[in-house]
């Protein structure tokens, strides 16, 4: 089923990091999303993470998290066709396409950091493609 959000292929068990500072608004099973976490960042923005294998110990409703904290692990729960992270941005209680959201730019990778990123990206993509055909 087509949905708003973006899917990131990754091996089962890959850590998932909070996209920003906030408070866990929901952590549990959520229908077709399977194991699901929603973080409230402020009065307008939330992020959601679905199909998780599990939650990091201590993650539950009301817990404060910081950007970059591990919150859970990639899985294949709910209505999922393989291990991946389904990621959503919710603005004013409406799902929006994360790819079209205008946010301040992040760090630009250069040199060795960029090389490491490209290598890891290719490994994750290759692993996911192998899982599709097993």
How would you label these PLM feature ranges?
Residues 123-134:
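C-terminal recognition in membrane/secretory proteostasis and scaffolding
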